């Protein structure tokens, strides 16, 4: 279609020349940012493809299985791909995990025991975790099972309260949960670099503590995971 035909189509939809020119100027101003996003997306796409190649994914892995799912080659290989892409020792990728909150509950309840302490050094987590942890009373919460919850709020500028974090860690601190997304708060979303710095600080204080990152919506937005 020639330019005149395209202009007529826009006009028929009520999109004026001024709006089209404004959109073109905006896209031009953001071109470098769009190119940077495309570069990250392309890199991560290659990373996923390599993970599939390294684990020799083929048509056989897409065949249905029956029974209890023992030796489910497709499921096991999918988890191997996830582990490769995210550089993990292993992965748990199952349709039985119904939501992010469900996955976090599994991780928390699987690692914490009565008398252990859970620390959030980035303030209060998502509202959906309040009943899981026991911030709001709930049957079956971690609090009900004797897990103690502590939090250290970020400073107003979004920086970590390292002094407060160090003071909150003790011999009973078993797991530190770090929520990457700002959730419903106004703080900045955490970068991989900042999370790494925080974990290094915590590990220097208590090397055996478990650091769990809720990556919520953060997958593939950087070249590092």
Regions flagged by a language model, labelled:
Residues 2-22, 31, 48-54, 61, ...:
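Conserved PLP-enzyme active-site core in the AAT-like
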Residues 24-88:
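Glycine-rich phosphate-binding segment of PLP-dependent enzymes
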Residues 79, 93-94:
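Short secondary-structure boundary micro-motifs
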């Amino acid at each position: 279609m020639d330019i005149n035909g395209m202009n007529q189509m826009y006009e028929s939809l009520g999109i004026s020349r001024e709006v089209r020119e404004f959109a073109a100027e905006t896209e031009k101003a953001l071109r470098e940012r769009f190119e940077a996003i495309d570069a990250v997306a392309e890199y991560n796409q290659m990373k996923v493809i390599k993970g599939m190649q390294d684990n020799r994914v083929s048509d056989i892995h897409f065949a249905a299985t029956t029974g209890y799912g023992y030796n489910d080659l497709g499921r096991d290989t999918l988890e191997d791909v996830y582990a490769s892409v995210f550089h993990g020792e292993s992965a748990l990728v199952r349709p039985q995990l119904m939501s992010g909150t469900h996955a976090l509950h599994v991780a928390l309840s699987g690692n914490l025991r009565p008398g252990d302490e859970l620390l959030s050094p980035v303030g209060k987590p998502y509202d959906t975790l309040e009943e899981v942890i026991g911030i709001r009373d709930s049957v079956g919460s971690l609090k009900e099972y004797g897990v103690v919850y502590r939090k250290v709020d970020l400073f107003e500028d979004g920086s970590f309260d390292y002094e407060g974090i160090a003071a909150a860690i003790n011999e009973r601190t078993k797991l530190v949960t770090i929520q990457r997304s700002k959730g419903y708060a106004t703080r900045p979303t955490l970068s991989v670099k900042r999370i790494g710095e925080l974990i290094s600080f915590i590990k220097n204080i208590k090397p055996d503590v478990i650091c769990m990152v809720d990556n919520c919506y953060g997958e593939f937005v950087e070249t590092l995971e």
